[in-house]
């Protein structure tokens, strides 16, 4: 598992643990509002 900082338009930055970037995006999509969108995904150094 890696840590990813996922920046969204309305909710700011959400940090999630995921196996890869795609999985991190999927996890965030489940919790943000339907009108929100992901701006960037960045892997955090441990």
Residues covered by each model-derived region:
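A short, exposed loop/beta-hairpin motif centered on an aromatic-Gly-Thr core
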Residues: 11-20
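A general, composition-driven signal for non-globular sequence regions
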Residues: 1-3, 19, 36
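Short, mixed-charge low-complexity intrinsically disordered segments
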Residues: 30-46
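Short aromatic-glycine-(Arg/Gly/Cys) micro-motifs in beta-strand/loop hairpins
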Residues: 1-12
